[in-house]
């Protein structure tokens, strides 16, 4: 299985998700900024790309919604989960309009977040 790519400027969120997914034997690759993800996508072969992408919506140097748009241009079938501490309706609507698989408000319940990631992985495996 390809890694789950996690994008968040908050190191503690990345750490918690990495550890929780490692317990589920799900590989991860983490990024701090959206630009790192775009560069990695441009450099990655099909087998090196993400199984799914989990991204914060608001980060210094870029928006998760802008990243969603760029990722969907490159990998239209890739499930993308958008996380945000700003659980407002406008952000959720924008995420879904941009093609997000799901919207995860922070703070999140870790078991529910892991369950959502499993569902996204299953969806991506159906797309392959």
Specify the residue positions occupied by each region the protein language model found:
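Short amphipathic alpha-helix used as the core "switch/output" element in two-component signaling
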Residues: 39, 65-76, 94
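Active-site beta3 strand of CheY-like receiver
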Residues: 46-54
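C-terminal output helix
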Residues: 90, 104, 108-117
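Acidic catalytic/metal-coordinating carboxylates
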Residues: 32-33, 63-66
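The feature encodes the CheY-like receiver
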Residues: 14, 60, 84, 88
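Two-component/phosphorelay signaling modules centered on CheY-like receiver
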Residues: 2, 11-29
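Short hydrophobic/Thr-rich beta-strand motif most characteristic of the beta2 strand and flanking loop
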Residues: 25-40
